[in-house]
Amino acid sequence: MSIILIGFMGAGKSTVAKLLAEEFTDLDKLIEEEIEMPIATFFELFGEADFRKIENEVFELAVQKDIIIATGGGIIENPKNLNVLDRASRVVFLTADFDTLWKRISMDWQNVRPLAQDKEAAQLLFEKRMKDYSLVADLTIDVTDKSPEQIAELIREKWEIE
């Protein structure tokens, strides 16, 4: 059975997934393989609506495997994805206050985040998404003062993962 990590940009989903399993799936990487370009480029060329459609198709295939999945922060934007998450039995919501996440996003030069170019817009997006993250989560972890290793250990303990 899959463990699906959800949360806003900068929450540490990919980092924690790497600690939980050597073989994990970063949904953004699968999407980039499918579209054959960086997500930021796809957003620029085709827009968010087309991206969310492809994201859903790739996500529905990924959850059928027994793997750790680090999702993109906007996975909950598509109602179809909410249904998939609602049916999944191990969904972990990594959360923190907006200022903590914004600081992390601002310091991350490796990832281009099309929806995080403006702080005010990002904060509105954060506020909009928080409720949906909470609704589908089986486990919520506030990551503010925790290391990725501590977060991974909490998840392992919850589901007795080696």
From Swiss-Prot:
Its cofactor is Mg(2+). Binds 1 Mg(2+) ion per subunit. Gene3D superfamilies: P-loop containing nucleotide triphosphate hydrolases. One of its GO terms (cellular component) is cytosol. SUPFAM superfamilies: P-loop containing nucleoside triphosphate hydrolases. GO terms for molecular function: ATP binding; magnesium ion binding; shikimate kinase activity. It comes from the Bacteria. It is found in: Cytoplasm. Substrate binds at residues 28, 52, 73, 129. Keywords: Amino-acid biosynthesis, Aromatic amino acid biosynthesis, ATP-binding, Cytoplasm, Kinase, Magnesium, Metal-binding, Nucleotide-binding, Transferase. Its main location: cytoplasm. It catalyses: shikimate + ATP = 3-phosphoshikimate + ADP + H(+). Pfam families: SKI. Pathway: Metabolic intermediate biosynthesis; chorismate biosynthesis; chorismate from D-erythrose 4-phosphate and phosphoenolpyruvate: step 5/7. Its EC number is 2.7.1.71. GO terms for biological process: amino acid biosynthetic process; aromatic amino acid family biosynthetic process; chorismate biosynthetic process. Belongs to the shikimate kinase family. Monomer. Catalyzes the specific phosphorylation of the 3-hydroxyl group of shikimic acid using ATP as a cosubstrate. This is Shikimate kinase.
